[in-house]
């Protein structure tokens, strides 16, 4: 027991040292903010954040043996950076709402709890918030591994001049939530149609006699469950904390490989980090082999394409545009050359942005 007592003393000493260093970091962040403000420099620099994350992950693994989990380290440093940044300026983030949805969760994972968040009713509203500079950033869903692409997000890039400034990939884990503390009390289950579709087998097997009801969002389902102990909601863990609901059953989604990718949008371009993606859209001429000739450019320059999607151009029937994600930054020599060639082989080319790849997804 004496050894336990001494170890706890050592933990107390370390905690005090961590607290001292956090306050030192906060003071430095405030000073940096003052310098940036005087020089009219952007307060938030995502490229610098990426550099910090990569450094601490590398040090944790290579120098300290990786005893502390990498994913937990990312979450901790996200909040440290978010809190320090808020001392310089409160970052304003618009997202597809309402609160406690997966888009809200993605935004929190990217910007931390110290940012100021504005939920929006539609994807278009998120774009408008960024375009009008009412928000510094926006967060919108773009694709799910089961449900596919979010077409409305892609369509917005056809008409908007905002840039892609980041991506977030999160696992979609669904839970049965309720104000009751027993699953036996649940008589109705509410959720968004997509969430219900993704856990249909579990519901049929475990709650075969329960009525399943679609509502406009997982957040609305939680609001109903909060008021009625006989109601259950299918939603995220963030929703459980937000609405103070009990988690009656965890991970009820039918597939374990359920991920959603979100895009961060902004008004400015980002500098290369060395681990980037570039997103573009282009239209080809209505002639045989036009798409082949366009895509051949990337093969020629040894550039890997991670995604390609087609969407109607909305200009005339059977006219399509192509959305492509590729590895590399637009300022890299080979990417720059490829995009220059591509412009000559297409009707139009629009670079949507170059941005760091999602952390821990490389």
UniProtKB/Swiss-Prot annotation:
Domain Chorismate mutase: from-to ranges: 1-92
InterPro entries according to UniProt: ACT-like_dom_sf, ACT_dom, Chor_mutase/pphenate_deHydtase, Chorismate_II_sf, CM_dom_sf, CM_II_prokaryot, Preph_deHydtase, Preph_deHydtase_CS
Domain (ACT) ranges: 279-356
Site label Essential for prephenate dehydratase activity, positions: 260
SUPFAM superfamilies registered for this protein in UniProt: ACT-like, Chorismate mutase II, Periplasmic binding protein-like II
Free-text function comment from the UniProt entry: Catalyzes the Claisen rearrangement of chorismate to prephenate and the decarboxylation/dehydration of prephenate to phenylpyruvate.
Protein name: Bifunctional chorismate mutase/prephenate dehydratase
Organism name: Aquifex aeolicus (strain VF5)
Gene that produces this protein: pheA
